[in-house]
């Protein structure tokens, strides 16, 4: 069991495979505790997000239309011993299940629907003093 930083409002989410410069990961509102804070920032009870402007890696999807991907997902909780308001906390390093990104690929002179599978990870908890396991 390893002890890790607990994710708070302002944490950083990153893709493990693609993304691109104009890709946005937008955390859905109203998922933080109204009672529990770490370093003055609200702790996440759940962490659902939407993805827009996604570009698949050229090595795997060379015909992907840049910025055409979108999808949504949720970080999977790994904490076993720390809960807030009945929910296990989200830790730095936690990842989502595989997310299906829907987008477009070039096919000749037109585009066709395509998908790519991605994983999102909490790479920075947004604070470094409060830890959980």
Where are the model-predicted features located?
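Intrinsically disordered, low-complexity proline/glycine-rich segments
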Residues: 1-133
């Amino acid at each position: 069991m390893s002890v890790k930083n607990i994710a708070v409002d302002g944490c950083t989410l990153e893709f493990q495979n693609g993304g691109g410069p104009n890709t946005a990961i937008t955390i859905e509102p109203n998922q933080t505790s109204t009672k529990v804070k770490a370093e003055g920032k609200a702790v996440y009870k759940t962490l659902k997000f939407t993805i827009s402007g996604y570009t698949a890696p050229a090595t795997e999807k060379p015909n992907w239309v840049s910025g055409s991907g979108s999808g949504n997902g949720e970080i999977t909780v790994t904490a076993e011993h720390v809960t807030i308001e009945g929910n296990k906390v989200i830790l730095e390093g936690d990842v989502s299940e595989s997310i299906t990104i829907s987008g477009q690929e070039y096919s000749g002179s037109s585009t066709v629907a395509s998908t790519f599978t991605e994983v999102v990870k909490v790479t920075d908890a947004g604070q470094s003093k409060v830890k959980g396991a």
